[in-house]
From Swiss-Prot:
Biased composition (Low complexity): 36-50, 73-107, 114-212, 258-284, 291-350, 371-421, 440-465, 511-522, 544-571, 581-593, 686-699, 710-727, 734-745, 882-928, 946-977, 1082-1146, 1194-1214, 1243-1264, 1347-1384, 1456-1480, 1487-1498, 1518-1528, 1612-1625, 1676-1723
Biological process terms in GO annotation: box C/D snoRNP assembly; regulation of gene expression; regulation of macropinocytosis
Listed Polar residues bias regions: 51-72, 223-237, 244-257, 351-369, 483-510, 632-655, 673-685, 929-945, 1147-1159, 1176-1187, 1226-1242, 1529-1543, 1665-1675
SMART domains: HOX
Protein name: Homeobox protein 5
Subcellular location: Nucleus
Chief place of localization: nucleus
GO MF assignments: calcium ion binding; DNA binding
Coiled coil: 300-351, 1193-1270, 1431-1464, 1632-1702
Compositionally biased tracts (Pro residues): 746-755
Protein role: Putative transcription factor.
Ranges where the record places region Disordered: 36-425, 440-522, 543-756, 878-978, 1080-1214, 1226-1264, 1345-1399, 1456-1498, 1513-1547, 1598-1625, 1661-1723
Biased composition regions of type Gly residues, renumbered to the chain: 660-669
Length: 1723
């Protein structure tokens, strides 16, 4: 397991960057060995790929990390995420983290079995410590830190403590510092650093540097960490016993530390976010890796980076992380402090990337990983880092192209898998990560431009290509030649400097050898595993994650510098990322090179046609000497010729749309797109015209070779693609694809022919057709589809191929990615990045990917429609249940907001922080901790598709790129039933071993910018993310888990609705129709909230970043609510909210409604309802007020919330939920190209800071009140958990629910929505109250959007009045959502909604029915009640009254009929039996519908009984009162059983219907001359009529006895009495029967008419309230959350940190976390 210690900024001042570590965890315990733990301290960064990770035996008295790598090796990370979620619920990150470990332990994934308990204990301790800290208000910060240290002598505990502290905001900073220290194994130092960092960044940096450089060395306290009150924390050296054995955890190896950091972030919502987003990042970024746990860890690293970014560590953290990575904390800190500037930020980013690279060093797919980049360092640091680079298997960091002139390597563990292609480039992702094996040789190695000296440099840049160092005679690569060169090159910097460093530096021979050896080891490992394609993440995913990480770093840097968005852009475009071990590949196998006809000549001319200046060359410093070596591309390394004579790629230039070198004529690839269309090759001049799609995209002219003929030409004799060779799979059918999730595996020939350079895989038209059929839907729209889904299918398809073809495909994809990289780099202009630029690049990249599958790339490319992917919920038993596609609509827009919050904390950093927040949020979302929830609730294994949208921080192009990535993010879950291996291949972890996790499917694909778990790039338009739809539903950072985050372009059902659904602004509040408890709403709205929950984590991070804000928050959170606050923060209750800490602030005073003891609401919960402090929440359900708040102006309100500090046009940028038959679909609105200028941001920040200072005193006062209330409530519980309400003496009443077990080692904040139910303690889970158990078992809708309210509370506390107002409105929306979520019963459904019954299988096997509402979602009204809603209520009440009146009338009519029958001269035979068991079969339920229910049987009936049954079903009888008047003369008269005298015999009462049926049966029996009914017939009749066999038998006996006097052959009228004989009586009775039937028919018609009228009325009402009552496709209440509220929460946090805009973002983060928690409960 590798850990990257990422510094998280606890910066108390924006100007003062502080170090905090948000550790990104690559739980790659597979690669840890006990030897690694025992490595000397001077070699903490030296990694060896190991199969197992064994921690040294540590003294339990001195808590230390006990790791058993074996556990982690499996799905430990996923389980880890799950655990994180639980822990988040129990306690923030720590609890989640511990839970993650705990789950892992239960799953056997977790290396920390001892620590899992310890970790849980630690988490509990952390929680307790946090609680103590909170209670102590950071007095016990030292204690908590000590506890954390003690716990974390597993760095994790420290992290959790840090997170708790982060939650405290004061503690956040301190704790984050501690976490960082723990990560560095210098907890004290980190504390000092954080405290100092907040105060003195340089000192912190130094400490961090020391820690980073001497992670293992600095276990001892170099400086005493100070509490928030600057009280030195006294640590017992024994308590903080971090031995060299722990060194692996520290430094790059500190995977656990990173995780802890992430946990901290998540704990403070960041860690959960991180863990969630990490999980998702790993899933999204390294889906396959997650399966391997390597990817998961890589994802963690990315997430961790994001977490750091999110933690407002984003700025400082990025710096710190970078510092840790670079071991140049001082410089980084200085850069951060000074730079929140582009250079320092870029450096930090590079460093940050480096830290990822180092973490990846232990990954099994280290070749796919990037090594840390060295910056200018002291010789000892350089030597240490160099040693690490040499030892680590990773060789590929990707450097981001920062406009600041500094390059930041954005390679995340996932991103290294990307081959120097733009993060959005799908092909590069496919080339590197799509397939599990590394190419022994790459067709081309894109020259990654190294950063200038002092900048981070990619490890691959260090490694040279096969050629010798001589660069003479070689033409320097041009600007457009490689994305990496552009990304690494500061476009603003002079071209002279660019030309001066255009050559790539060659790494030392030892490094090359080591890399080659590592590659061989990797390959060997893969071979041993029996798979050539290990489940690595898709490059796109990994890139997105990497980009997100980079973005986080960039965002952090941008936050620091504002980074000109160049960092962000560079990160998403991290074209500098080279193909993993490209040098190794180039040199690894000559035989393979020969196969592919790929060579590495000394000095080939590259891109000789490129007019742009060459990229900067990478230079590495070793031993004080600088060796420069340019990348050499072999002249033999050419794209396959068109005629097929030469080629190493399945792609022809035409197919790929690339302008490849002329057939064997030499020369490298030409730029993919040339604005001027000039090329040096004559062949290119005659290339066909670009495709119409490219023309429409204004992408420029493609230089294509005329290779159309070659594509259709037959295969050469040497071709390995003959139809009979078995290499191609049989044409799959839709059934196979749907059922197996992939194409059937073809039979592999026993001896496949060797792959030759003549092969052109696409020359086989059959194969091309198959690719088209599987990968090219007919109706594709780039803005409405996620590319990753095609990539996933493509991966599945390729995996069915034989190895030669697989390698061929990989080679071709690599070529495509390299060319695409050049294209990206060619048109890059950091100064003029348009919003459409990145979007077009993404589209171009995808189109190129598809063009390779076309016979004629110039032909019109049909836009494929997204193939429906049915989202599935996988229960704990592994069964796949079709879940409501609820969570899918969650978009990572809020994540962007989270990043914004972090950025705000650091500096003005509004944009940068936003990016960071996005990363953090993404991370939170990624964690599917819901699966680990130990409650009885089922955890929906929802795929989280987080889409990070960096709004302000990102340039418009970056925002668009994020949106594109989000759109491309995988939306659905796996289709059909897949095997475990297949799920793992998809990056889906089925944590069936965990008690609760129905499915630990973490599938979020982070957008490249959003970073960490899908990033929040989706809604980049709004800084606040308020308009953005939180992409992460997955249990918000702390609680979230297992949430679906759906790409906005996809409907919840996974199918795209062709109709443009009516747009709905997620940010706008949605008014939900009243829902009964049984109804489960779609998670779509809630998903936004989940994103907001992620933002909550960011808020915690924000607290850490901005000490001032944190202090304010701490004052609010820590002093009064400290313990609760931590829990609250974990629950996504806003830490930042002043005195609202952990409490839910309602936008307005509300009349609370209480919940009855059964947990059902006595009153409806409406949109806009707020949860008052006095609400009865003992059942775990949030009460809501009866009052409906009239909606304010939705657009205006949202815009106010979003625009508080967002300079984005929210109305334009709002993500719209569209109505579709399949469910809600989310579409992105246009993104504004404008970003606020730095001056505007500074002004806003100044204004916000002033406002914050004014609010601080109020917050303190509120905290005191809350603190008293908390002690009162917390002291009230003994042993068991209790819910307590916290009343805030504030304009807004907020109710906090704390699930406290004072005797447990950890206090668990129980999300009122039941986000986390298990309470971990040393002794084990604490008992839960009956109300809690009820909520756990019954509340599928447990996900209440109280989080949004929390966000609102935070907003009010932190944000300006305007923002607060907006936030309040948003909160109301959240409340509505919460109400909707809470309601377990199904309310009357709108007429236009078609309810579909689905079932959710809980972890205990109970099937819970859930309704899916399918209808249109219209723009929800704002919070305030509207006359329409009031009218709707009144109308509904009137309808109910009318129904009651109708029922009464029906009863009266029935009574009248009975009286008429009684008055008739002829009475029916008084032998009708009526038993107490009699149940009216067709009796209508008096309350609800007027439809009658019939009980049918499937038993075959005899001819005798079939008539009666036919009459029963064909004839609808009006409902009859169960008890008609007893009259010996009535139709339902009493029948004597004949056993007793008339006076004493018991009377059985039959209904008229029963009597009539039995008489009919008796008459039919007589007609058929049957002597008696058989026992079977009697049983059938009794079953039909709801009677017992005895009753029916006695009835017939009595009937037979009375009918004996009449001739046997003469049928007796069943209704005639034995005393009344004669035709007259029979005729009279028949007449009465006819009248009765007529009356019944009339009544039925009346009922139908009434029903129709009611339906019409409902439709009218629904139309009237169409704007106010959105109808969610799926009723999973968890998912229903509103991003608006979350945005508001983020705003509050940002206000605490910087400006209101940032606060809004922070608030959004808080909401996301809560949503995640909610999702976790539901799941």
């Amino acid at each position: 397991m590798e850990t990257i210690v990422n510094n998280q900024n606890n910066g108390q001042q924006n100007t003062v960057p502080t170090q905090s570590f948000s550790s990104s965890v690559y739980m790659n315990y597979d690669f840890f060995d006990s030897q690694q733990l025992q490595q000397p301290q001077h070699q903490p960064q030296h990694y060896q790929q190991q199969d197992s990770f064994v921690s040294p035996n540590l003294d339990n008295n001195n808590p230390q990390i006990h790791v058993q790598s074996n556990n982690y090796n499996q799905n430990g990370f996923v389980g880890y995420n799950n655990s994180n979620n639980n822990n988040n619920n129990n306690q923030h990150m720590n609890n989640q983290y511990s839970n993650s470990f705990h789950n892992n332990n239960s799953s056997g994934f977790m290396a920390f079995q001892n620590n899992s308990s310890n970790f849980n204990n630690q988490n509990n301790n952390n929680s307790n410590n946090n609680n103590n800290n909170n209670n102590i208000n950071s007095y016990d910060y030292n204690n908590s830190n000590n506890n954390n240290y003690n716990n974390n002598n597993n760095t994790h505990s420290n992290n959790s403590n840090n997170n708790n502290n982060n939650n405290n905001s004061n503690y956040w900073n301190n704790n984050n510092n501690n976490n960082n220290n723990n990560n560095n194994n210098n907890n004290n130092n980190n504390n000092n650093n954080n405290n100092n960092n907040n105060n003195n960044n340089s000192n912190n940096n130094n400490n961090n540097n020391n820690n980073n450089n001497h992670h293992h060395h600095h276990h001892q306290q170099q400086s005493q960490p100070t509490s928030p009150y600057n009280n030195p924390i006294q640590h017992n050296p024994n308590d903080m016993k971090f031995n060299g054995q722990h060194n692996p955890f520290n430094g790059n190896q500190m995977v656990m530390d990173n995780n802890n950091n992430n946990n901290n972030n998540n704990n403070s919502n960041v860690f959960n976010s991180n863990s969630n987003s990490n999980v998702f990042n790993s899933n999204s970024g390294s889906f396959l890796q997650i399966n391997n746990n390597n990817g998961s860890f890589s994802s963690y690293n990315n997430n961790n980076n994001n977490n750091n970014n999110n933690n407002s560590n984003s700025n400082n953290n990025n710096n710190n992380n970078n510092n840790n990575n670079n071991n140049n904390n001082n410089n980084n800190n200085n850069n951060n402090n000074n730079n929140n500037n582009n250079n320092s930020n870029n450096n930090n980013n590079n460093q940050f990337s480096q830290s990822y690279d180092s973490t990846l060093g232990n990954n099994r797919f280290s070749s796919m990983m990037g090594q840390p980049i060295q910056q200018q360092q002291s010789p000892p640091q350089q030597q240490q880092q160099q040693s690490f680079i040499q030892s680590s298997p990773q060789a590929i960091p990707a450097s981001n192209c920062n406009g600041n002139g500094s390059t930041s390597s954005s390679t995340s563990p996932l991103s290294p898998t990307l081959i120097g292609s733009a993060p959005g480039t799908p092909t590069s992702m496919l080339a590197t990560t799509l397939f599990g094996f590394n190419l022994s040789s790459s067709p081309t190695s894109s020259p990654s431009s190294p950063v200038k000296k002092g900048k981070s440099q990619s490890a691959l840049a260090l490694s040279s290509s096969g050629g010798s160092g001589g660069s003479s005679g070689r033409k320097k690569p041009q600007k457009h030649d490689s994305m990496s060169s552009i990304t690494n090159t500061n476009l603003k910097s002079t071209q002279a400097s660019t030309l001066k460093e255009s050559k790539r530096s060659n790494s030392s021979p030892n490094l090359k050898k080591q890399m080659q050896l590592q590659q061989l080891q990797q390959q060997q490992k893969l071979n041993e595993n029996g798979t050539l394609i290990p489940p690595l993440p898709f490059a796109s995913i990994s890139e997105n994650i990497t980009n997100n990480n980079n973005n986080n770093n960039n965002n952090n840097n941008n936050n620091n510098n504002n980074n000109n968005n160049n960092n962000i852009t560079n990160n998403p475009l991290s074209g500098s990322m080279e193909f993993p071990n490209s040098n190794n590949i180039n040199q690894s196998s000559d035989s393979i090179n020969g196969e592919f006809n790929i060579g590495q000549p000394e000095s080939p001319k590259m891109y000789n046609s490129s007019p742009s200046p060459p990229p900067n060359a990478t230079s590495t410093t070793k031993g004080g000497k600088k060796s420069k070596k340019s990348l050499h591309i072999s002249t033999t390394q050419q794209s396959p010729s068109l005629n097929g004579s030469t080629g190493g790629s399945m792609l022809t230039p035409t197919m790929s749309g690339l302008s490849l070198s002329g057939g064997g004529s030499g020369g490298g690839f030409s730029p993919l797109i040339s604005p001027t269309g000039t090329t040096s090759n004559k062949d290119l001049q005659s290339s066909p015209s670009p495709s119409p799609l490219l023309k429409s995209m204004s992408m420029g002219k493609l230089d294509l070779q005329d290779s159309i003929d070659s594509m259709s030409s037959p295969l050469s004799p040497n071709s390995s693609l003959s139809s009979s060779n078995g290499l191609l799979p049989p044409p799959p059918n839709s059934n196979n694809m749907n059922s197996s999730g992939g194409i059937p595996t073809p039979s592999t020939p026993t001896s496949p022919p060797p792959l030759t350079h003549h092969i052109n895989i696409f020359s086989n038209l059959e194969f091309v057709k198959q690719l088209k059929d599987h990968l090219l839907p007919n109706d594709f729209k780039p803005e409405e589809h996620a590319l990753e889904r095609n990539l996933l299918r493509f991966q599945q398809f390729v995996k069915t191929l034989a190895e030669p073809l697989q390698r061929d495909v990989v080679t071709s994809m690599f070529e495509l990615s390299v060319d695409a990289q050049l294209q990206y780099g060619s048109n890059l202009d950091n100064d003029n990045l348009s919003a459409l630029m990145l979007f077009r690049r993404k589209i171009l990249n995808f189109n190129l990917f598809r063009m390779m599958m076309l016979n004629d790339p110039n032909s019109f490319i049909p836009l494929p429609s997204p193939f429906p992917i049915q989202t599935t919920t996988i229960s704990s038993n592994g069964t796949i249940v079709n879940p409501t596609n609820v969570n899918n609509n969650n978009i990572n827009n809020n994540n962007n907001n989270n990043n914004n919050n972090n950025n705000n904390n650091n500096n003005n950093n509004n944009n940068n922080n936003n990016n960071n927040n996005n990363n953090t949020t993404t991370t939170t979302t990624t964690t599917t901790s819901a699966n680990t929830v130990q409650s009885g609730t089922t955890s929906n294994s929802n795929l989280v598709f987080q889409q990070t949208s960096n709004s302000n921080t990102l340039s418009p192009s970056q925002q668009q790129q994020q949106q594109t990535q989000q759109q491309q993010s995988i939306n659905g879950s796996s289709t059909g039933s897949l095997s475990d291996a297949q799920y793992q291949d998809l990056g889906i972890h089925l944590d069936t071993s965990s008690a609760n996790s129905g499915c630990g499917i973490n599938v979020s694909i982070g957008s490249s910018i959003g970073g960490g778990g899908g990033g929040s790039s989706l809604n980049g338009s709004n800084l606040n993310g308020s308009s953005s739809i939180s992409g992460s539903i997955s249990g918000g950072s702390s609680n979230g888990g297992g949430q679906f985050i759906m790409s906005p372009q996809f409907s919840l059902d996974g199918a795209y609705q062709q109709q443009q659904p009516s747009s709905y602004n997620i940010n706008n509040e949605m008014e939900l129709a009243e829902k009964d408890e049984d109804e489960i709403f779609n998670n779509n709205n809630k998903d936004n909230n989940n994103n907001n929950n992620n933002n909550n984590n960011n808020n915690n991070n924000n607290n850490n970043n901005n000490n001032n804000n944190n202090n304010n928050n701490n004052n609010n959170n820590s002093s009064s609510i400290n313990s609760n606050i931590n829990n609250v923060n974990n629950c996504n209750i806003n830490n930042n909210s002043n005195s609202n800490n952990g409490s839910i602030n309602s936008p307005r005073p509300s009349t609370p409604t209480t919940l009855n003891s059964s947990g059902k609401r006595s009153k409806k919960i409406y949109r806009g309802d707020s949860f008052g402090a006095g609400n009865d929440i003992s059942t775990g359900l949030m009460a809501s007020s009866d009052q409906i708040i009239p909606p304010p102006q939705q657009q205006q309100h949202q815009q106010l919330v979003n625009n508080n500090n967002n300079n984005m046009n929210n109305s334009e940028n709002n993500i719209l939920l569209a109505d579709s038959n399949k469910g809600l679909s989310v579409s992105l609105g246009s993104l504004p190209t404008n970003t606020p200028s730095s001056m505007e941001i500074e002004q806003q920040q100044q204004q916000q800071q002033q406002q914050q200072q004014q609010q601080q005193q109020q917050h303190l006062n509120q905290q005191q009140i809350l603190h008293q209330q908390l002690h009162h409530h917390l002291s009230s519980s003994l042993g068991g958990a209790q819910f307590t309400n916290i009343q805030q003496q504030q304009q807004q009443q907020s109710g906090n629910i704390f699930y406290n077990s004072p005797y447990n080692s950890s206090q668990v904040y129980m999300n009122p929505y039941g986000t986390s139910i298990t309470n971990t303690s040393l002794a084990g889970p604490s008992t839960t109250s009956s109300a809690m158990q009820h909520m756990i078992t019954n509340m599928t809708s447990s996900n209440i959007i109280v989080n949004n309210q929390n966000n609102n509370n935070n907003d009010q506390n932190n944000n300006n009045n305007n923002n607060n107002n907006n936030n309040s409105t948003t909160n109301s929306n959240v409340n509505n959502n919460n109400n909707t979520t809470n309601t377990p019963s199904s309310p009357p459904q709108p007429n236009n909604c078609t309810p579909t019954q689905t079932s959710i299988i809980t972890s205990n096997g109970v099937v819970v029915p859930s309704l899916q509402m399918r209808g249109t979602i219209t723009n929800p009204p704002p919070v305030l009640p509207t006359p329409d809603t009031l009218v709707l209520q009144q109308q509904q009440q009137q309808q109910q009254q009318q129904q009651q009146q109708q029922q009464q009338q029906q009863q009266q009519q029935q009574q009248q009929q009975q009286q008429q029958q009684q008055e008739t001269p002829h009475t029916p035979t008084s032998n009708s039996i009526s038993s107490p068991r009699s149940s009216p079969v067709h009796q209508q339920s008096p309350s609800n519908t007027n439809t009658t229910t019939t009980s049918t049987t499937t038993i075959r009936h005899s001819a005798v009984t079939q008539l009666s049954f036919a009459g029963l079903h064909n004839q609808q009888v009006s409902p009859i009162s169960p008890r008609s008047p007893r009259s010996p003369h009535g139709t339902s008269g009493d029948y004597n059983d004949g056993s007793q005298s008339p006076s004493s015999r018991r009377k059985n009462r039959f209904t008229d219907f029963q009597i009539k049926r039995m008489n009919d049966c008796f008459e039919n029996l007589d007609k058929n001359n049957n002597g008696k009914f058989t026992s079977e017939e009697i049983c059938q009749i009794a079953t039909e009529l709801g009677l017992t066999d005895q009753q029916v038998r006695v009835f017939f006996q009595n009937k037979r006895a009375r009918s004996r006097p009449s001739p046997r052959g003469q049928p007796t009228n069943p209704l005639t009495s034995s005393t009344n004989n004669g035709n007259n009586s029979n005729l009279a009775l028949q007449h009465l029967q006819q009248q009765h039937l007529q009356q019944v028919q009339q009544q039925q018609q009346q009922l139908l008419q009434l029903q129709q009228q009611q339906q019409q009325q409902q439709q009218q009402l629904h139309q009237q309230s169409a704007n106010t009552t959105p109808q969610l496709n799926s009723m999973n209440p968890n998912s229903i959350n509103y991003n608006n509220n979350n945005n508001n929460n983020n705003n509050n946090n940002n206000n605490n940190n910087n400006n209101n805009n940032n606060n809004n973002n922070n608030n959004n983060n808080n909401n996301n976390i809560i949503n995640n928690n909610i999702t976790t409960i539901n799941e």
